[in-house]
Each structure stands twice: as C-alpha cells, then as structure tokens.
C-alpha cells in the first residue's frame, strides 16, 4: 500500500517538475491570430522543455516596441515578422548572429546573407485586392485588373487599405508601388488613390474582412487573408494586379541580449525545419524551404508570377523616411487606434 501511494505521489509530481524545468521564451510576432495556437503547439511538441509566450501585434507596433526596448530587450525571439523590420534591427545590431541547423537549405533570397546568419525566412506574403462581386454589382463598380484602375472616380469611398505605419501589409503594398513606378511616381499614384480611400486600417487583414462583409467594394490586403476568406465562401474575387504586386518575407531572429540563448537557438532550429515549413504551407504557398508542398487551397498562381523586384536591404534603410512621409500626407483618413 505504501508503495502504491509513493508511486501515485511520484506520478503527480513528475508533470509539475517537468513544467518547472521548461524554459519560457518570450516571442514577439505579427502572425495572424489563428496561427498562434498551432505554431505554439508544434514547437512545444518538438521542444519538450520550451514554453512559448507570445506577444502579438501588427507589424508596425511590434517593430516600434522592439526598437524602443533595444537597451533592455524583453523579447527572446521574433518568429513571424517582416524582413524589412528585421533588416532595420540588423542595422542597429539588435539581432543575435546564429545560423540555425539546416538553414543553408533555405532559398538564398529568403535568408540572411551574413555568416553567421542574423535572420531566416519562413515564407513570402503578397499584396492582393479583395473585390466584393455582390457590392460591385449593387454599386456599379468595375472589376479592376491593375492598380491604376483603382483611380476610377467610381471607387470614391469604396476602398479600404492598411496604414503602412501599423501594418506590414500596408508597407509591402506601398513598396510594390515604389518598385513599379519609382518613388516619385508612387507618391503621385498614392495622392490620387487617397481621394478614393474611405479609411486606412491598422491591420492587414481588416480591409479584406471589410470587403468580405460587404462594407466596402474593395479591400487592399494580402494573399493569406484573401484566400482564407474566399475558401470560407465570402463573395470576393482575389485580384492580383497585372502591373505587379509587392511582397515581403515573414522571418525569424534571435534578439541580442536574450537571457535564454540556448533555448532560443533550439527554437530557431525548429523554425527552419521541414515540420515548421509544412506548418507555414497551411497558410502560404511561397515557402523558404524548397521541396515542401504547400497545402493551402485556392491559391492563385498569379501571385508568384507577378512579384515585383525589390531590394529588401535598401528599402529597410528607407523605411522610417517613407513611413514618416506617408504619415504626413495621408494619416487624416486613418481609423482611430
């Protein structure tokens, strides 16, 4: 009887001891909310002694917070943030140099060129137009095929777009226009587009959600959200403008100054693994790890075919200046925070 009681006591204590031995990693992210639970579950299943504590917000908010905390970092890692943001932090020596195990297999244009690496890519996300076909018929809105088509006066008050200062989607959309038209041409285009914009949101998903609900005819958003809503039956067409679309990389990095460096390195190893890439492939089709078949349904092939060429490092250095100029010109139509 005494042996049974001791055994039961041990079984009760063992899970508690295991929990106490786990290293808690504070991970900053701009992943979509529905990605947080599966990412955490997969990582913690692979790394039994690691616990992930997410800090999640839009790209602009997370980036500003990380930079503000530079002298006293609170994040151990970043998992799922714009490469533009990470390159900006790299220039400020905020990222811990580390080449995750297996990272050499990633596509060369989707990982750090430094040795050791300072960041590793996960996938690419791409700007898209969510076009509500029911609203379009009701309000006599023409189906756009190019960005230029959105300047039609019939779209006045019918377009919502993410604020680039808050949203990585807003920034990559603007970057696409700059790459396509040159900076001066892009500002001229945005001046005219601004006349048709009803509101700038603080989330990259919000414009497509708005369009899917029929609140507006057009939402400028990104591939994952547009495909997900279309698959759920929303009355939207996913339009990939023929004049080219901007894109960004979701990426991962260890923050310099983390007190949990060894655990962070192990999580970084996991983020470049095939298991992680298969997880990314549930949401995106343009993956950093070759040979992994994405499982996301209904992803238009035009996304990969119409990517504009962009110099990530150059744009990262200009990010603050571009965002300040955008703020000066257009912030009057931004949604309340």
Locate the predicted segments by residue:
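An extracytoplasmic/periplasmic, membrane-proximal ligand-sensing/linker region
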Residues: 183-185, 288-337
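Conserved N-terminal structural module of periplasmic/extracytoplasmic solute-binding proteins
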Residues: 19-77
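A bilobed periplasmic-binding-protein/Venus flytrap-type ligand-binding module shared by bacterial periplasmic
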Residues: 130-135, 175-178, 249-260, 279-280
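Mature extracytoplasmic/periplasmic domains
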Residues: 255-311
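A ligand-binding cleft/hinge motif common to bilobed small-molecule-binding domains
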Residues: 84-88, 212, 216-235
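Extracytoplasmic ligand-binding site segments that recognize negatively charged/polar headgroups
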Residues: 22, 30-37, 60, 74-215
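Periplasmic-binding protein-like
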Residues: 105-109, 125, 189-194, 200-201, ...
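Bacterial N-terminal signal peptides
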Residues: 2-14
């Amino acid at each position: 009887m005494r042996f049974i009681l001791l055994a039961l006591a041990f079984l009760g204590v063992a899970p508690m001891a295991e929990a106490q031995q786990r290293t808690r990693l504070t991970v900053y992210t701009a992943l979509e909310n529905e990605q947080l639970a599966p990412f955490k579950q997969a990582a913690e299943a692979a790394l039994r002694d690691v616990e992930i504590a997410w800090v999640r917000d839009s790209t602009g908010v997370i980036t500003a917070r990380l930079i503000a905390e530079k002298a006293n970092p609170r994040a151990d890692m970043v998992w799922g943030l714009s490469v533009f943001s990470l390159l900006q932090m790299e220039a400020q020596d905020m990222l811990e140099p580390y080449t995750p195990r297996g990272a050499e297999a990633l596509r060369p244009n989707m990982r750090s060129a430094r040795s050791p690496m300072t960041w590793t890519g996960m996938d690419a996300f791409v700007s898209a137009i969510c076009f509500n076909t029911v609203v379009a018929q009701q309000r006599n809105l023409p189906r756009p095929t190019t960005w230029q088509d959105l300047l039609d006066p019939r779209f006045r008050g019918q377009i919502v777009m993410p604020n680039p200062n808050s949203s990585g989607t807003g920034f990559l959309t603007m970057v696409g226009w700059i790459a396509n038209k040159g900076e001066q041409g892009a500002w001229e285009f945005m001046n005219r587009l601004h006349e048709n914009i009803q509101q700038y949101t603080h989330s990259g998903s919000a414009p497509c959600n708005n369009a899917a609900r029929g609140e507006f005819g057009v939402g400028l958003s990104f591939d994952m959200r547009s495909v997900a809503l279309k698959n759920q039956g929303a009355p939207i067409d996913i339009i990939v403008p023929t004049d080219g679309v901007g894109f960004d990389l979701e990426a991962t990095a260890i923050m310099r100054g983390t007190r949990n460096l060894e655990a962070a390195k192990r999580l970084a190893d996991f983020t470049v693994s095939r298991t992680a890439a298969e997880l990314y492939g549930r949401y995106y089709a343009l993956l950093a790890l070759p040979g992994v078949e994405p499982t996301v349904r209904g992803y238009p092939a035009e996304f990969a075919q119409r990517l504009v060429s962009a110099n990530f490092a150059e744009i990262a250095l200009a990010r603050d200046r571009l965002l300040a100029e955008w703020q000066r010109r257009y912030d009057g139509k931004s949604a309340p925070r």
